[in-house]
Regions:
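Secondary-structure capping and boundary motifs in well-ordered enzyme cores
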Residues: 90-94, 98
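Hydrophobic/aromatic-rich core segments of domains that either
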Residues: 97-169
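Short, well-ordered strand-loop elements centered on a beta-strand within folded domains, enriched
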Residues: 17-22, 86, 90, 135-141
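Secondary-structure boundary elements
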Residues: 32-87
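Catalytic cysteine-centered active-site loop
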Residues: 75-85, 92, 113-123
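N-terminal accessory/pre-domain segments preceding catalytic cores
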Residues: 1-55, 170-272
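Conserved hydrophobic/aromatic pocket- or pore-lining residues that grip, position, or stack substrates
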Residues: 64, 68, 95, 106
Length: 272
């Protein structure tokens, strides 16, 4: 966070490169850096106190994702938004800050994590590549903060898990890493949020799906998201629960119906 870039000098003999010197561009003095690091360390210690260092990889990754998505505001005007100061000191950031903070916290928890730069929906973006239980996945913490979409549906308490531990194929529906970045192909699904939480359906079973929504409604959850294996199942669920309003058969007393669609990831979210 105390370096904004670098300059370099090439030394050649004839046409042969013999040496290369890099000089960082510092953004603060050493004393300022130490003071800022102390502030960051204090916040990070408070955050990590909420998770057992011996917890399973999935639990650690979800804890970090949940914390950042819930407690750090998305703001394009946030100061220092290209580094972790924006997150741990100011509490507001953009995609680069979310990705850098996710990496910082996960590496503190001994989970390998890298920041990936590229585009999402055609706009410059940053997210993470993580290794959970020996397998690689993608995580986009920025998109976990549902207010990022700015659709004004009262989403302050909602966490969007549609890009928590996804495969390369799922990611590439909306995200594209820069061409100069070499990343592994992510194929594992065990630690995907919907698979891990039993919210993933690959066959149509109205009652089983409806009972998932019912359980969330009856225990007072504000939202419930279910993911389907393909577009056909997703559209079948949308028609059944939303168009035909069969959700009221499972959620007794529900007087209004609000929902979120994600046809890219085949996720149907109902707000209670």
């Amino acid at each position: 966070f105390w370096v904004s870039g670098y300059t370099y000098t090439q030394y050649t003999r004839g046409e042969k490169l013999v040496d290369l010197h890099f000089t960082p561009k510092f953004t603060m003095t050493d004393a300022e850096r130490m003071d800022m690091q102390a502030q960051i360390d204090e916040t990070v210690s408070q955050i990590l106190a909420g998770i057992d260092a011996q917890a399973p990889d999935y639990d650690k990754a979800k804890y970090v994702f949940d914390y950042l998505a819930s407690n750090v505001a998305y703001s394009t005007g946030a100061p220092d938004n290209q580094n972790i100061i924006s997150v741990f000191v100011n509490g507001e950031t953009v995609c680069q800050g979310y990705a850098a903070a996710t990496q910082y916290l996960l590496e503190k928890l001994d989970i390998p994590c890298a920041v990936v730069a590229g585009t999402a929906d055609g706009q410059s973006h940053a997210w993470n590549l993580v290794k959970l239980d020996g397998e690689y996945y993608y995580i986009d913490t920025t998109w976990g903060n549902a207010t990022y979409s700015g659709d004004g549906m009262g989403l302050d308490s909602f966490i969007n898990y549609n890009y928590f531990a996804v495969t390369t194929g799922e990611l590439q529906k909306t995200h594209q890493p820069n061409d100069d970045i070499i990343v592994p192909v992510c194929q594992a699904v065990k630690d995907n949020y919907y698979v891990h939480e039993n919210l993933y359906f690959d066959t149509w079973d109205a009652d089983s799906i409806g009972n998932v929504y019912r359980a969330a409604y009856e225990q007072g959850d504000g939202f419930c998201s279910v993911r389907f294996a393909d577009r056909e199942l997703y559209e079948q669920a949308f028609t059944y629960f939303i168009t035909d309003q069969k959700i009221v058969h499972y959620c007794k007393g529900l007087t209004s119906l609000y929902y979120l669609e994600d046809s890219d990831q085949n996720v149907l979210t109902i707000k209670f």
